[in-house]
């Protein structure tokens, strides 16, 4: 695969590189992060457009994990911690209730709501969409490898709450919800998914820098 450069611009890019104490030990200020700093890292050209349910390799995954956020993220010990989710209640090994934090936004300014997860997962699971990560949804009621179907196990309760019904007990299902296949998609994605994959709108700490930020086989700027 061709090598590409990944550029991240802004204070968040330095968050992992600066001291958490804010003091240099002699009473002076250690200095604030530079919001105009540019961090450059090596990567490889994504094999596919940047759609979470169709990305299963490192080149694209590395970028998706910066521009999207899921229901949970995994801490340094690999344990899930709530991100977009306010709470995930496992009613039993086959039924879950997800409540979202209010006020979370995509970079186009629209709010992240329950339907953004439901529609994204249905898109990923639909046979005719031929998504590489469709198997992530196989435990949800309504999933089929043989025909286009709706994930009937996903029900919107209100703008910030939805339920998940599984077709069989899966005690570890809640632990999987930080995987990129489970990221939400904004309404705009469904207007033109091909175009969206070239310039995705996410809900994570970074966004694609401009319409032409992805220079294929060269670099991508966030």
Residue ranges of model-derived segments:
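N-terminal export and membrane-targeting signals
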Residues: 1-8
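Bacterial lipoprotein signal-peptidase II cleavage site
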Residues: 17-29
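Short, well-ordered beta-strand elements
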Residues: 34-45, 95-98, 117-120, 162-164, ...
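N-terminal lobe/hinge region of extracytoplasmic solute-binding protein
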Residues: 42-92, 201
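Aromatic- and charge-enriched surface segment that lines or borders ligand/interaction sites
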Residues: 86-132, 163
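Surface-exposed binding/hinge segments that line
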Residues: 89, 134-187
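Gly/Pro-rich hinge or "lid" segments in bacterial periplasmic/extracellular proteins
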Residues: 170-222
